[in-house]
């Protein structure tokens, strides 16, 4: 099985909260697609609560679009990581890590301004696969933590696992 890009970086050295350009690729028409690793907490040290990350998934996607989408950037998708330490954001365009961090900060402030659970978008059995698994309070706790700690930048060249280690770790 091919080694995915996200597994070529050393998760023990990742800072969080932090933005990282996980991948860039060109479409046949010449558009650039950028995938960002939006790391909310340190891998293997902390984990986002189930209800909190689910509520953030519903809120964060819209708020990030409000702050990042422009004539040069269009968010395709924002999805939680299976390890529950952050989100992946795929978009058309090449915003800087600082622009993404500023949008993320503004989105966390927006989360804190949501007044009640009934303001969570698509919170119903028709549009959500587990609509009873939400907590606005837990989402706000996550947002408060991000705002208190500030958002840094993780660089791939600083996190790259050496080839020798990748070979050693190779699953047979």
Curated annotation (Swiss-Prot):
Molecular-function GO term, any one: iron ion binding
Keywords: Autoinducer synthesis, Iron, Lyase, Metal-binding, Quorum sensing
Binding-site residues for Fe cation, renumbered to this chain: 54, 58, 128
A biological process from GO: quorum sensing
Cofactor binding, note field: Binds 1 Fe cation per subunit.
InterPro entries referenced in this protein's UniProt entry, alphabetically: LuxS_sf, Metalloenz_LuxS/M16, S-ribosylhomocysteinase
Gene3D superfamilies registered for this protein in UniProt: S-ribosylhomocysteinase (LuxS)
Cofactor(s) recorded in Swiss-Prot or TrEMBL: Fe cation
Enzyme Commission code: 4.4.1.21
Function: Involved in the synthesis of autoinducer 2 (AI-2) which is secreted by bacteria and is used to communicate both the cell density and the metabolic potential of the environment. The regulation of gene expression in response to changes in cell density is called quorum sensing. Catalyzes the transformation of S-ribosylhomocysteine (RHC) to homocysteine (HC) and 4,5-dihydroxy-2,3-pentadione (DPD).
Quaternary structure and partners: Homodimer.
Protein name: S-ribosylhomocysteine lyase
Gene behind this protein: luxS
